[in-house]
Structures are given as structure tokens and as C-alpha cells.
């Protein structure tokens, strides 16, 4: 059974870590089902503090990816890819947002710059399974924060070299580990980042 036609072009799915009947879905908006997919409702709008038709920085949504973590089952994380016109050019960028207590907050905003640029196919996002504040996402490179409450998002990989290859398609943390490594599927294969390794190191 498919969901309402309004919700077509779904690209992201995630189950709530502590409730197998609750499913999140994303495409150009974000949705929730609390009954195993029988009915769906939006998780955005003014009542949630995140209006997809009026995003900060005038970004127009292209695609959204989502993820969850067992470290904070009530949280939903979103990677919102968009575009905007700047100086007669179309520039890609993204917001990273967290839904908690029925309210979204944007924790990171970034626009394409140099070799760090966005595309529809490079939209990986992952959160540590043991630390809900360790958030990482990727485009051509890995970007992240080891603690979103105190550490600004920054580059966590080179463009190419030193164990890493550009253009990231997937990010997955090791499960059932006290200090999990981050695995990265990219155009060069699979790269692995160990922690703690700030900045571009650890690959």
C-alpha cells in the first residue's frame, strides 16, 4: 500500500528506534506514520517551526534525507538540500535540523564553496549510536560536529587522499560499540574514520 500521491518521490525512510510501528519518510517534505504506514501526516509547517516553503536563507527544497539514533529515540535528524539564486547563479546548500519535542531547530547551514559542494546524490547523514550530539553529513566531503552543543560543524575529511575519496553516498556507524567508527561509502570505495580524530584526520 502506497502513501498519498502528495507524498511521492520518497527518498528517505527510518524507523523510530524504540517503536517499530512509527516510521519516518522524506522526499521534498518530512512525514510520520504511527501505525506501520497505514496513515501519514506531515512533520513540518509553522506548528513545528519549520516551513518547507519558507526556509531560512531562501533555500528552495530539492531533496531531504533523514536519520535516527538509539542514543535519543525521540529525535529525528534531517538533511535538507536546497538551492537559491545568488548573483545570477544557482547555488546549492543545506540545512541540518533536529526534531525534538515536536519542534525543529536548525543546527547547521552551509552553501557550496570550492571543492565542498552539494548534489542530489551525495546526501548521507549519520548520528553516533552512542552519542546523539555527534552528527555527521556529507556531500563531496564529510562535515560534522563531535558535540553539537559545543563544537561547530566543520570539515572532517580531505577532498581526496589520506584514506578518503570524494563524493559520499552513504555513512554508517558501527553498531554495538562503545567508540564506534564511521564508515563512508564513496566514489573510491569504503573509507573508515576513527575517533577521536578532529578535523580531517583519522581515515
Model-assigned labels for residue ranges:
Residues 1-203:
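Beta-propeller blade termini and top-face loops
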